[in-house]
Each structure stands twice: as structure tokens, then as C-alpha cells.
């Protein structure tokens, strides 16, 4: 089978399954968040937590709940890592160092799963499921809750800014969506050979004749939510390139589908909740255009042959698993960087300059193609407001979106939400490059303008883009175990996650306080091909104006060498 045919069949299968799941999954999630009934287990949780499930919260009450819950989660995870040595199933592992524990706690609570440690030799089989896997569920549920709160801002009329109840949204997202879906995915992965074990490991003899210790862990259960919740942190160091996590081409497709399922179907949920499904289809079309374009660039770049090794192999196979090949690796890479997942089944640092630049650009677009669980929906909705504002300026009318006027307050909050990520990426990269002491941690270096120094810059840019977008993938040539990277990337993960959430919730409250205005002949249509083009152009223009100089110094310069 030719590589082109293999790529086409895999892409067609993924798109076909997503198309089949789009309506039922999207409508199911809409029913979950709009239901007035609580499950029995939910009622028990509310009673134990003294939560009034019928009480509504204003945006600042909702935001305070998000921040309070996330802070408590981070503290719990931090101290769990620090006392790991006295916990069950520690297998001789001591407590995690303060810097790594801090970075990891922020990383998993922020849905980033950036890993500056080797999982097999750092985290025990107790901390993995009790600490990290739990955060994989609840951090994803937090993102979904914030997205639904913003949607309520559009559909509620003069409600005093009430946008729902965070604790109810968190509980329903975890128990009704993430848990059952993860269970099904875990069973499928188990059938493909993904392991599920609490044994410490086993010894074997390698091909070179030396003894090898193979780590075992409860992988299947965590692998499912790792992908479904767009978390991405591997329970094994090689992540989804490891045969214990992703053993077959079919398991690879299942993991790609798990990554894309909820972000794609949330556009249907949005359309259903606002009462106009064309709105959701328009957002989905924009996501699809961006995702398809970057996938085409990545496939073309990786299928070419550049350099002696690539020419001999016929394609850029360095850093890729033979069982997946170019199509499975490129499809996974674009899926994982277009969402906030960050899981990898190949070495992104070994990709061609244009291929690596494409997955980097996928993050720099704001991870909206299709975006993370919840974060993708509220990210593209904020950009839709900017597009409507630009359209309103062109025709000289007050911009409106779904019957809500976009005044100074709304546009200011939308702009602030968009500006957080670029500021963190560019400032963090600039400071790191200026600091001469950090150059020793780059796997590539040299005099300015040489290929090594250019790729070294790309590694730093990728790291801060990944942390600030809560992605978690990396160009592995950069060593990030120093105190500078542990602290700076931790701050980027923290601010990149929670500052946009605060601005989005404030925006939801402002919208929910308004009355709806009836559309007129001069109202800009926000569904259909015209708005699809306007929104796509806005996304590309914002990213191009912001990041083109940095990309020109990194991937583009390397591609032109």
C-alpha cells in the first residue's frame, strides 16, 4: 500500500467516525448540561459537599470556585508527590523533589501534563492513578464547565450575570461524560494489548544481551482519559510511542479519535444549546479548514526526503515508529497539537523544519483546531467575537453575536483573553534566549545563524508555546530540568490556563446580564460561508501578526537553510 493511500484511508476513517458520533455525542452533552435532574450518586456528592445544586453563581462566584478547586487540587497533588515514599506501591521510589513536584502539580491541574521527569523512575503506581489520573478527569471537566458557562452567557437574558453552578457542571462532566466514555475507550485499548497492571515491572534481556527492567503500570485506564480529556501526560516516558501505551495501528486510530471526539462534538453541543445548529457547524467548518491545512503541510513535509538518512529511507522516518509510519505519526501530531493534548507517538524534535513548524503553528493559533476539551470551544468563540467586531467596524454598526451586543467591556475581555498566550510565549522565549546560562540546556546550539542555533531557538519557542497553551508536548532536545525552566514554564502553565478562564467567565457574566436584541437587515450573519471565511481569516491574521517574526527566526529560517 502506498503511503498516500494509507494516509487517505486513515484520515477518511477518522473523519467518518467523527461524523457518525457528531450528532449523538453533541446532543448528549447538551442534555447533560441542561438537565434539571441529578443522578443519585451526584445527589450524594452534593450532600457530602454541602452543595445546593439548584443555586446559581455569578461569574465571579463561578471563577472563585474554579480557582479554589484548582488550588486545592494542586496542593493535594504536590503533597502526594512529596510523601510518595511512605505511600503504598512506592516500589522504593522516594518523594519527588520540590521543583519537580511544583511543576507537575501545576501541569496536571492546568490540563497541560508537561513532564520534566521520567515517569517510570519518578512516579509510583499509587501516585499515578490517585494523583495524576484524577486530575486528568477533573481538569478536563473544568475546561468543559467554563465553555458551557460561556454558552449560557449567550442564551440567558437579563439574569443578573448568573451563568450556572460550577460544582454541578464539574460533577456532571466528570461522571456523565468523561468517566463512561473513558471506560469504553480503555476496554478497546485493552483489547489491542495496552497493559493494565500494578506490578512494579519485570526483567528481560535486550537485543544487545544486557538485562533490561520493563516498567509496568495501570496504563489502559489512564491512557483513555489521557487522550479523551486532552491531557497528554504519558504513564511511560515514551508516551504513545511506547508499545505498552499504543501497540497497534488500530490503537493509534482509537487514541486519535479519543483526542478529537469531545472538542469536535462540543460545537454541536453549542449549536443545540443556543437553538441554532448552523452556528456550531460554522465553528466546526473553521476548525476543519485549519486542521486540514496544517495536516496537509505536515504530511507533505514528512513524506519528503531531506538529508542523507531521510533520502535513504525515502521519507523523514527518524523519530517515528515503523508500525505507524508517516501517516499515523503526522495525523497524531496534528491532532495532539491542534488540541491541548500534547501526547506524542513520534519525536516532534526530529520532524522536518516545515513539519515541526506546522505543529508549532497549530499551538500558536490558540489550539482551536479543534482545541482542547472545553478550551477549544471557548477559545474559538472569543475569536468569533473579535471577527464580529471587525465586521461591525467595516459596516459601521454595533457588533452583535447571537442577539447580544458587543460593547467596550465585552471586546476588552475578549482581547485580554487572546493576548495572554502570545505575551507568555514571546516574553518567556525572549528572556530565555537572553539568559546565557540557559544555552547549555539546548540540545542544539552554535554561532548565530547556523542550523544548530536556529533549531535551538525553535526548541525554546516550542517549549513556551506548549506550556502557555497547556499542551505539554516538547521538542525533546531541550533539557528542562533546571530551576529556570521548572519555574518559568510552571508560571506560563498557570497563567496560560487561569487568566483566560477568568476573562472568559467575566465575558460570560457580561453577556448573561444583557437583553437580546432582534436581528435586523444590517446584522452580520454569523453562520454560513461568509462568516466562516471571516473567522478563518481573523484567526490566521492574529497569529501571523503576532508570531511571524518568531517563526521566521526558527522553523522558517531552518527550512530555508
Swiss-Prot record:
InterPro entries (alphabetical): KdpA
Membrane topology type: Multi-pass membrane protein
Localisation: Cell membrane
GO molecular function per UniProt: P-type potassium transmembrane transporter activity; potassium ion binding
Gene Ontology CC entries for this record: plasma membrane
Pfam family, one: KdpA
Sorted UniProt keywords: Cell membrane, Ion transport, Membrane, Potassium, Potassium transport, Transmembrane, Transmembrane helix, Transport
Keyword Cell membrane: yes
TM ranges: 5-25, 60-80, 86-106, 130-150, 177-197, 247-267, 281-301, 324-344, 376-396, 415-435, 491-511, 533-553
NCBIfam families per record: kdpA
Subunit structure: The system is composed of three essential subunits: KdpA, KdpB and KdpC.
Stored HAMAP family: KdpA
Family: Belongs to the KdpA family.
Function: Part of the high-affinity ATP-driven potassium transport (or Kdp) system, which catalyzes the hydrolysis of ATP coupled with the electrogenic transport of potassium into the cytoplasm. This subunit binds the extracellular potassium ions and delivers the ions to the membrane domain of KdpB through an intramembrane tunnel.
Protein name, per record: Potassium-transporting ATPase potassium-binding subunit
Organism field: Rhodococcus erythropolis (strain PR4 / NBRC 100887)
Amino acid at each position: 500500500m502506498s503511503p498516500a493511500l494509507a494516509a487517505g484511508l486513515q484520515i477518511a476513517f477518522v473523519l467518518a467516525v467523527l461524523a457518525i458520533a457528531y450528532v449523538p455525542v453533541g446532543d448528549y452533552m447538551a442534555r447533560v448540561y441542561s438537565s434539571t435532574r441529578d443522578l443519585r450518586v451526584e445527589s450524594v456528592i452534593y450532600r457530602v459537599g454541602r452543595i445546593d445544586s439548584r443555586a446559581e453563581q455569578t461569574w465571579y462566584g463561578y471563577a472563585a470556585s474554579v480557582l479554589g478547586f484548582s488550588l486545592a487540587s494542586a496542593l493535594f497533588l504536590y503533597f502526594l508527590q512529596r510523601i510518595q515514599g511512605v505511600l503504598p506501591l512506592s516500589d522504593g521510589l522516594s518523594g519527588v523533589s520540590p521543583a519537580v513536584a511544583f511543576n507537575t502539580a501545576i501541569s496536571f491541574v492546568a490540563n497541560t501534563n508537561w513532564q520534566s521527569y521520567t515517569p517510570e523512575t519518578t512516579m509510583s503506581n499509587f501516585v499515578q492513578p490517585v494523583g495524576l489520573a484524577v486530575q486528568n478527569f477533573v481538569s478536563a471537566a473544568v475546561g468543559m464547565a467554563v465553555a458551557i458557562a460561556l454558552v449560557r452567557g449567550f442564551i440567558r437574558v437579563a439574569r443578573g450575570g448568573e451563568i450556572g453552578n460550577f460544582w454541578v457542571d464539574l460533577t456532571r462532566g466528570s461522571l456523565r461524560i468523561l468517566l463512561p466514555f473513558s471506560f469504553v475507550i480503555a476496554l478497546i485499548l485493552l483489547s489491542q494489548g495496552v497493559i493494565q497492571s500494578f506490578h512494579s515491572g519485570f526483567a528481560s534481556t535486550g537485543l544487545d544481551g544486557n538485562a533490561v527492567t520493563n516498567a509496568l503500570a495501570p496504563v489502559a485506564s489512564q491512557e483513555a482519559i489521557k487522550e479523551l480529556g486532552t491531557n497528554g501526560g504519558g504513564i511511560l516516558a515514551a508516551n504513545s510511542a511506547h508499545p505498552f501505551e499504543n501497540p497497534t495501528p488500530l490503537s493509534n486510530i482509537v487514541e486519535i479519535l479519543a483526542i478529537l471526539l469531545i472538542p469536535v462534538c462540543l460545537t454541536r453541543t453549542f449549536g443545540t444549546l443556543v437553538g441554532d445548529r448552523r452556528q456550531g457547524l460554522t465553528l466546526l467548518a473553521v476548525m476543519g479548514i485549519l486542521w486540514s491545512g496544517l495536516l496537509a503541510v505536515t504530511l507533505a513535509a514528512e513524506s519528503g526526503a531531506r538529508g542523507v538518512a531521510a533520502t535513504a529511507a525515502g521519507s523523514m522516518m527518524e523519530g517515528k515508529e515503523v508500525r505507524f509510519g508517516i501517516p499515523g505519526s503526522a495525523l497524531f501530531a496534528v491532532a495532539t497539537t491542534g488540541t491541548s493534548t500534547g501526547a506524542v507517538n513520534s519525536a516532534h524534535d526530529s520532524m522536518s523544519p516545515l513539519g515541526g513548524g506546522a505543529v508549532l503553528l497549530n499551538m500558536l493559533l490558540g489550539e482551536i483546531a479543534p482545541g482542547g476539551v472545553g478550551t477549544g470551544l471557548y477559545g474559538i468563540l472569543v475569536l468569533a467575537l473579535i471577527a464580529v467586531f471587525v465586521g461591525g467596524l467595516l459596516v459601521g454598526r454595533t457588533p452583535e453575536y447571537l442577539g447580544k451586543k458587543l460593547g467596550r467591556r465585552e471586546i476588552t475581555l475578549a482581547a485580554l483573553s487572546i493576548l495572554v498566550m502570545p505575551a507568555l510565549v514571546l516574553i518567556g522565549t525572549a528572556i530565555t534566549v537572553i539568559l546565557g546560562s540557559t544555552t547549555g540546556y539546548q540540545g542544539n546550539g552554535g554561532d548565530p545563524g547556523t542550523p544548530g542555533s536556529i533549531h535551538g531557538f525553535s526548541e525554546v519557542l516550542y517549549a513556551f508555546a506548549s506550556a502557555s497553551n497547556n499542551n505539554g508536548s516538547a521538542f525533546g532536545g531541550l533539557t528542562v530540568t533546571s530551576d529556570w525552566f521548572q519555574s518559568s514554564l510552571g508560571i506560563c502553565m498557570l497563567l496560560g490556563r487561569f487568566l483566560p478562564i477568568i476573562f472568559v467567565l467575566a465575558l460570560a457574566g457580561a453577556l448573561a446580564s444583557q437583553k437580546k436584541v432582534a436581528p435586523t437587515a444590517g446584522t452580520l450573519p454569523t453562520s454560513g460561508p461568509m462568516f466562516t471565511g471571516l473567522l478563518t481569516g481573523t484567526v490566521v491574521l492574529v497569529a501571523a501578526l503576532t508570531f511571524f517574526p518568531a517563526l521566521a527566526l526558527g522553523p522558517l529560517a531552518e527550512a530555508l537553510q
